[in-house]
């Protein structure tokens, strides 16, 4: 059955717009939206969980002006190597997520996430440092000063 989603090499149930750069070994789950219309680079070895949406454009100004502002805003998204995006996370235009970062399920990423950082919530906020030691991974809580 044809569901109307253009074919792509990652997942038959992922909607990929434009021509994003996706590194080797990256896994893309079902029901994802990868918007490459404003420039999207996803590094190697990432997991983009089911239901993740990554946007590189916004039609807010066009919409609220009744189309008096005809432009669609666009800004690239950059995702580093070995980044995990949890189920149903949303990444908004203009964001950079550093290498080995972890974004929790349902998080909405509106600003940059540093490398090796766990970010959760709406909006996504850094809560822990990701420490990788061989095959072991641990999350070291950040001090509350990060939220001020």
What are these regions (language model features)?
Residues 87-111:
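Beta-rich strand-turn-strand
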Residues 1-8:
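A transmembrane-helix-recognition feature enriched in membrane-embedded lipid enzymes
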Residues 43-45, 49, 100-106, 116:
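Outer-envelope exported proteins of Gram-negative bacteria
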Residues 106-107, 112-114, 124, 130-131:
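Short glycine-rich donor-binding/catalytic loop of glycosyltransferases
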Residues 119:
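Conserved active-site beta-strand element of glycosyltransferases/polysaccharide synthases
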Residues 9-22, 28-96, 122-123, 128-138:
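Flexible, glycine/small-residue-enriched loop-and-beta-strand segment within the central core
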Residues 135-148:
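Acidic/histidine-enriched, glycine/proline-rich intrinsically disordered or flexible terminal extensions
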């Amino acid at each position: 059955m044809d569901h109307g989603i253009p074919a792509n090499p990652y997942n038959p149930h992922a909607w990929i717009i434009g021509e994003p750069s996706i590194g080797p070994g990256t896994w893309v789950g079902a029901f994802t939206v990868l918007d490459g219309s404003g420039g999207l680079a996803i590094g190697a070895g990432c997991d983009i969980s089911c239901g993740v949406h990554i946007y590189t454009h916004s039609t807010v100004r066009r919409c609220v002006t009744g189309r008096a502002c005809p432009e669609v805003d666009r800004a690239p998204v950059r995702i580093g190597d070995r980044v995990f995006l949890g189920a149903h996370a949303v990444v908004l235009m203009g964001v950079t997520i550093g290498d080995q970062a972890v974004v929790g399920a349902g998080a909405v990423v509106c600003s940059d996430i540093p490398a090796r950082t766990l970010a959760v919530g709406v909006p996504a906020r850094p809560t822990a440092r990701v420490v990788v030691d061989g095959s072991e991974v641990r999350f070291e809580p950040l001090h509350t000063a990060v939220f001020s």
